[in-house]
Curated annotation (Swiss-Prot):
Gene name in the database record: sepF
Major place of residence: cytoplasm
GO cellular component, one term: cytoplasm
Protein name stated in the entry: Cell division protein SepF
Compartments, as annotated in UniProt: Cytoplasm
Family classification: Belongs to the SepF family.
Pfam families (UniProt xref): SepF (PF04472)
Keywords: Cell cycle, Cell division, Cytoplasm, Septation
Subunit-level organization: Homodimer. Interacts with FtsZ.
Organism name: Bacillus cytotoxicus (strain DSM 22905 / CIP 110041 / 391-98 / NVH 391-98)
One GO BP annotation of this record: FtsZ-dependent cytokinesis
Role: Cell division protein that is part of the divisome complex and is recruited early to the Z-ring. Probably stimulates Z-ring formation, perhaps through the cross-linking of FtsZ protofilaments. Its function overlaps with FtsA.
Length: 156
């Protein structure tokens, strides 16, 4: 008796062979479906409307506040930063402070403005404008300041 006859006698029946052949054919069909590109289907095309730049009037009013401040000590820097966090632009006049404290406030506010994605611009000698991300600063002010600025004594 050959090995194939023994194997056939103990393991494979004609029904099992037929089931295995059917599974093999089914697997081949699935592989062909995966290899073929999908059929193109007609999908109705809807026209995409461009976004409208509509802003409610209340939102526009709220984001258009400008706060004018004249701090006298460095401890007021946190209050200025709170205005910026509240999405309000701030104009700061630092002329009534010592230069050292004014530099510290500008450094602090520069970090704050960077953290909220805003901007800081110098408007004049010791006068700055800090804006949050919802306010854009357009244009520039020429640097025709006093003689102190021209002699480069302490420029910051």
């Amino acid at each position: 008796m050959s090995w194939s006859k023994v194997k056939y006698f103990f393991f494979d029946t004609p029904e099992e062979k037929e089931a295995a052949q059917y599974a093999y054919e089914k697997e081949q069909i699935e592989m062909k479906k995966q290899q073929e590109p999908p059929e193109q289907q007609d999908v109705p095309f809807t026209k995409v409307q461009p976004k409208q730049n509509v802003v409610s009037i209340e939102t526009a009013k709220q984001s258009s506040k400008v706060v004018l401040l004249e701090p006298r000590t460095y401890s007021e820097a946190q209050g200025i930063a709170d205005h910026l966090k509240g999405k309000r632009a701030v104009v700061i006049n630092l002329q009534r402070m010592s230069t050292d404290q004014a530099v510290r406030i500008v450094d602090f506010l520069s970090g704050t403005v960077y953290a909220i994605g805003g901007d800081i611009q110098k408007l004049g000698p010791k006068t700055f404008m800090c804006t949050p991300e919802n306010v854009d600063i357009v244009g520039a002010i020429s640097e025709l300041f006093g003689e102190e600025e021209e002699t480069n004594i302490k420029r910051w």
